[in-house]
C-alpha cells in the first residue's frame, strides 16, 4: 500500500504540482469528484482557493515550521525511518516555499477560511473537536438548529 503522506511522496508532490498540465488535469478531476456528492470533505493545499472556492466551510491549517518538523520527525521515527531532524525540517521548509511560490495554484488562504492553528493542539482529537464545533455552528447558522 502506498502512503500518500510519506516523505518520498511529499517531496515529489510539490515538484510535480508546479507543472501547469498536471495542475489542469488534477483540477478537473477534483472538481468532477466534488460535484458527484452533495457533501464532501477534501484536503489539499489549493482546495479552498482553486478547486472549491465556494465551499461552505474551509479550514486553513497553520503551524510553525519547528512544530511541524517535530511532528513529522516523530511520525517518521515510528515507521523506523532513519532520518535526522534537521533534514526533515529542511524538507518541510523547501516544500512550503515551493507551494506558496509556484505559479500554478499556489498555496493561499482564502479570505473566508477558518484558520486552525495546530501549534497548541497536541492531539488529533483536540483538533477534531475544535473543527467539529466550527462545522456544527456553520450548519446551525445555515440550516437552523
Spans of features found by a protein language model:
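NTP-dependent small-molecule kinase module
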Residues: 1-5, 10-11, 73-79, 97-145
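Residue-level signature of catalytic and energy-coupling elements of molecular machines
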Residues: 4, 26, 41, 92, ...
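Metal-dependent phosphoesterase signature
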Residues: 5-23
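ATP-dependent NMP and nucleoside kinases share a basic, alpha-helical "lid"
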Residues: 17-79
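Glycine/charge-rich, flexible interdomain linkers and switch-proximal surface loops
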Residues: 42-50, 89, 105-112
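Anionic, Ser/Thr-rich low-complexity intrinsically disordered regions
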Residues: 46, 60, 67, 83-91, ...
Amino acid at each position: 500500500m502506498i502512503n500518500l503522506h510519506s516523505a518520498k511522496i511529499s517531496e515529489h508532490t510539490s515538484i510535480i504540482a508546479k507543472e501547469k498540465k498536471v495542475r489542469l488535469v488534477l483540477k478537473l478531476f477534483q472538481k468532477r469528484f466534488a460535484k458527484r456528492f452533495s457533501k464532501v470533505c477534501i484536503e489539499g493545499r489549493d482546495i479552498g482557493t482553486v478547486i472549491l472556492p465556494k465551499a461552505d466551510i474551509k479550514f486553513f491549517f497553520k503551524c510553525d515550521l519547528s512544530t511541524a518538523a517535530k511532528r513529522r520527525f516523530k511520525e517518521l521515527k515510528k515507521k523506523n525511518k532513519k532520518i535526522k531532524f534537521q533534514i526533515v525540517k529542511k524538507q518541510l521548509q523547501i516544500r512550503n516555499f515551493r507551494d506558496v511560490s509556484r505559479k500554478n495554484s499556489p498555496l493561499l488562504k482564502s479570505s473566508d477560511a477558518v484558520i486552525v492553528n495546530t501549534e497548541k493542539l497536541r492531539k488529533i482529537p483536540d483538533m477534531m473537536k475544535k473543527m467539529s464545533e466550527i462545522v456544527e455552528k456553520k450548519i446551525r447558522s445555515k440550516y437552523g438548529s
